[in-house]
Structures are given as structure tokens and as C-alpha cells.
Curated annotation (Swiss-Prot):
Keywords, in A-Z order: Antenna complex, Bile pigment, Chromophore, Electron transport, Membrane, Methylation, Photosynthesis, Phycobilisome, Thylakoid, Transport
Residues annotated to bind (2R,3E)-phycocyanobilin 1: 82
Localization of this protein: Cellular thylakoid membrane
Family, as annotated: Belongs to the phycobiliprotein family.
Function: Light-harvesting photosynthetic bile pigment-protein from the phycobiliprotein complex (phycobilisome, PBS). Phycocyanin is the major phycobiliprotein in the PBS rod.
One Gene Ontology cellular component: phycobilisome
Top-level taxonomic group: Bacteria
Positions contributing to (2R,3E)-phycocyanobilin 2 binding: 153
Protein name: C-phycocyanin beta subunit
Length: 172
């Protein structure tokens, strides 16, 4: 796992060069935007159980076959596993937001997840829908202007959306 800083340094080191002005400017901007990033992660983390529960509730309302006998979320044990997986994905998305890089999400959460779901007979498309629902809720919470560092957060919200989209694509 590399954060944005370690990744840029590793790339420059591999080339045997100093950081370019563009790389330095990008890292400087990341530092300037750090409070917004921390605010977003704090808000998502503080509301994680609500985000997961509401996304699951909406998913099961749209796809009730998942919670009916024979469905992948039928029985308390399977439902708990579903909620746990959603929470884990959300947690790793927050790690990626904090790091400003998707490698922690990819390396520790998404790699091999589609194959695991296929082996278990879990419909990846349903998991992808749940992730999209978590994305919508997380962005709404993180982008609420009340009590957050002032300034334009559109680039950060786009970045956050990208992490959720990456997770959804990995399981679909």
C-alpha cells in the first residue's frame, strides 16, 4: 500500500530524478486539501453503520429475492455476512480517501473479491448495486456544507465517487 506521497517519491526514485514541478504541485494541493479529506472521512466513518444499513435496506427493497428463502442474504448468518462485507468495502474506501490513492482498496479488499463471490454464488451485480447505494449516501453526507472545511469539494467528491465506482466494477 502506498499513499499518494510514497507513490510519487517511488516513481521519481525509480527514474533517478527529483520530483517534477507538476508532482510537487499535486502533492502541495493534496496537503492544502487535507482538512477537507479528513472531514469527509470523519463524516463517512461516523455514519458508517447508517450508510450500510440504509444501502442494504434499499437493496433488499429493490431485490427482495435476496432475502427470501434460497436468496443469498436469507438467514441471519448470511445477512450478517452481507452487511459485514458492505462495511469492509466502505472501510477500505475511507482508507483510500485518506491516502489519496486506491492501492489500499485494491490490494487489501478488491483483489480476488469477484472470484470469491462467484465461488460462493453471491450475485456480484447485487453487491455492485449496494456499493452504488453506499456511494450515494456517503457523498451526500461528505458533501454536506454544514460544519465542514469551507471551499470547493467537487474534486474530492469526484475522487470519492471513483473509489466506490472502482469497488462496484471489481465485483460486478
Amino acid at each position: 500500500m502506498l499513499d499518494a506521497f510514497a507513490k510519487v517519491v517511488a516513481q521519481a526514485d525509480a527514474r533517478g530524478e527529483f520530483l517534477t514541478n507538476a508532482q510537487f504541485d499535486a502533492l502541495s494541493n493534496l496537503v492544502k486539501e487535507g482538512n477537507k479529506r479528513l472531514d469527509a472521512v470523519n463524516r463517512i466513518t461516523s455514519n458508517a453503520s447508517t450508510i450500510v444499513a440504509n444501502a442494504a435496506r434499499a437493496l433488499f427493497a429493490e431485490q427482495p429475492q435476496l432475502i427470501q428463502p434460497g436468496g443469498n442474504a436469507y438467514t441471519n448468518r448470511r445477512m450478517a455476512a452481507c452487511l459485514r462485507d458492505m462495511e469492509i468495502i466502505l472501510r477500505y474506501v475511507t482508507y483510500a480517501i485518506l491516502a489519496g490513492d486506491s492501492s489500499v482498496l485494491d490490494d487489501r479488499c478488491l483483489n480476488g473479491l469477484r472470484e470469491t463471490y462467484q465461488a460462493l454464488g453471491t450475485p456480484g451485480s447485487s453487491v455492485a448495486v449496494a456499493i452504488q447505494k453506499m456511494k450515494d449516501a456517503a457523498i451526500a453526507i461528505a458533501n454536506d456544507p454544514n460544519g465542514i472545511t469551507p471551499g470547493d469539494c467537487s474534486a474530492l467528491m469526484s475522487e470519492i465517487a471513483g473509489y466506490f465506482d472502482r469497488a462496484a466494477a471489481a465485483v460486478a
